[in-house]
Amino acid sequence: VSVCLGHVVTGIMGTNQPLIQRLIEAGVYRAERHWQLPLFPEYGVHIKSTVADINNLGGRPAQTSTAALFLKYFVPENTPWAHLDICGTAWIGEDTTQYFHKPYLPKRGATGHDVRTVAHAIEDIAKATAAKKCSIYTLLTGEKAKPKKKK
């Protein structure tokens, strides 16, 4: 993701637009930028395998989106989820392209990028579910949560 977004923007992908939008808005509030990348099913061809259920290395084309499709394989169907790809924003090295220094960031090393965003989004979702008296699933999908099947 750092090839296309550099060191100032985190890539975000997922299957639930309301969740993605909440994370993007939380990032705006916390001064951490995000850019949504596609999860087109056509990218799945890059992770097909002839010897396993799925291949974890999809090759160079659409690498970031392909990696997110790999993660999607392990998420239960109809579960809202999002992935923040912090490859470019997680670490400050000696690279001069890392021009996004903020007063709370170290000169070098781990940035903690998106910790503030995720914490803010969780707080926002908790407040929204309390105000609407609904589950997170209902908030994000507009559907009532399905009761769990008894064993």
Pin down the residues of each PLM region.
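A generic structural signal for tightly packed, nonpolar segments enriched in small/aliphatic residues
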Residues: 1-151
